[in-house]
């Protein structure tokens, strides 16, 4: 049996996902799967065959349980005393796009290929986005 190599150029589609009322982890895993190309029949682990995904209404994402009160995001600057923490609800107010980006990119490979996959993710607060020229398909049941 021989190894399958897809052609160099991959036809990439654009999808738009509405995060309104969606659960954070379930939406993130679905989007990560599309970005990595695992929904594509020509999927190859060492070639980026994923599609572009635009997520809108990031501020309307929901989470279950007590995570709204207990979940914290940490960032370390590398200096003594440089550990910063932010609660979920404060980050949802301040930068809801960052919550989705962090969740989705955490589900992608930690390599050059993973960075390329993460570069095809666009997250926006509100229903408007600047990618109308790409004619994205609405992704149902994301």
Swiss-Prot record:
CDD domains: Ribosomal_L13. GO terms for molecular function: mRNA binding; structural constituent of ribosome. InterPro entries: Ribosomal_uL13, Ribosomal_uL13_bac-type, Ribosomal_uL13_CS, Ribosomal_uL13_sf. Keywords: Ribonucleoprotein, Ribosomal protein. It comes from the Bacteria. GO terms for cellular component: cytosolic large ribosomal subunit. GO terms for biological process: negative regulation of translation; translation. SUPFAM superfamilies: Ribosomal protein L13. This protein is one of the early assembly proteins of the 50S ribosomal subunit, although it is not seen to bind rRNA by itself. It is important during the early stages of 50S assembly. PANTHER family: LARGE RIBOSOMAL SUBUNIT PROTEIN UL13M, RIBOSOMAL PROTEIN L13. Part of the 50S ribosomal subunit. This is Large ribosomal subunit protein uL13.
């Amino acid at each position: 049996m021989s190894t399958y190599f897809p052609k160099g150029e991959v036809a990439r589609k654009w999808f738009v996902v509405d995060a309104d009322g969606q659960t954070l982890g379930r939406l993130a895993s679905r989007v990560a799967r599309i970005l990595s190309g695992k929904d594509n029949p020509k999927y190859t682990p060492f070639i980026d065959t994923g599609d572009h995904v635009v997520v809108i209404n990031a501020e309307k994402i929901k989470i279950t349980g007590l995570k709204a009160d207990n979940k914290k995001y940490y960032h370390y600057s590398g200096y003594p005393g440089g550990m910063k923490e932010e609660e979920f609800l404060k980050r949802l107010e301040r930068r809801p796009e960052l919550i989705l980006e962090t969740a989705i990119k955490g589900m992608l490979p930690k390599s050059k290929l993973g960075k390329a996959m993460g570069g095809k993710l666009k997250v926006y607060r509100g229903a408007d986005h600047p990618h109308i020229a790409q004619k994205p398909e609405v992704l149902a049941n994301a």
